[in-house]
Amino acid sequence: MISASDFRKGVTFEMNGEPYVVLDFQHVKPGKGAAFVRTKYKNLKNGGTREEAFNPSDKFPKAHIETKEMQYLYSDGELYYFMDNETFEQTPLTYEEVEDAIKFLKENDNATIKFYHGKPFQVDPPNFVELQITETEPGVKGDTASNVTKTATVETGAVIHVPLFVNEGDTVRIDTRTGEYMSRV
């Protein structure tokens, strides 16, 4: 069990049978009245966030989240298949479960998959990936205002913003947490 007074950023806990992670917290001790812990937390299953004040003595079960490094194998159109790098066991996931991550994953790329009670609920691609530009407008010479970007489609189908000098066929480094262009490779 974990008490609300032990909340720190990144701590996982269960409430009403759902797993949550603490995003932000603040211990508040007003001049008058009882102390409380103002907490912003995220539901690990559906991604929803909430803010709530808890009594510091409130107790919650600790959510045990298992993390596995898995390799993205292929998609059959409906399901996305990942293989455990240790046991070689395959796990099929639906589009809803991989929605944000799949736009940055190529076949045979590794991803971190989080499990709650043996059921996968979150897929995290590597923080940085290198993908090839498959479609973009050519940069116009003389269009040199600072920080001008254009849209580009990468080989996985994701659409990102890149500087004007990036052309079709170039390989770029992307931060998957923000979806931003980092550099040309």
UniProtKB/Swiss-Prot annotation:
It comes from the Bacteria. Disulfide bonds: none annotated. The keyword Protein biosynthesis applies. GO terms for cellular component: cytoplasm. Pathway: Protein biosynthesis; polypeptide chain elongation. The keyword Protein biosynthesis applies. Keywords: Cytoplasm, Elongation factor, Protein biosynthesis. Gene3D superfamilies: 2.30.30.30, Nucleic acid-binding proteins. It is found in: Cytoplasm. InterPro entries: Elong-fact-P_C, NA-bd_OB-fold, Rib_uL2_dom2, Transl_elong_fac_P/YeiP, Transl_elong_KOW-like, Transl_elong_P/YeiP_cen, Transl_elong_P/YeiP_CS, Transl_elongation_fac_P. GO terms for biological process: peptide biosynthetic process. One of its GO terms (molecular function) is translation elongation factor activity. HAMAP family: EF_P. Belongs to the elongation factor P family. Involved in peptide bond synthesis. Stimulates efficient translation and peptide-bond synthesis on native or reconstituted 70S ribosomes in vitro. Probably functions indirectly by altering the affinity of the ribosome for aminoacyl-tRNA, thus increasing their reactivity as acceptors for peptidyl transferase. This is Elongation factor P. It comes from Alkaliphilus oremlandii (strain OhILAs) (Clostridium oremlandii (strain OhILAs)).
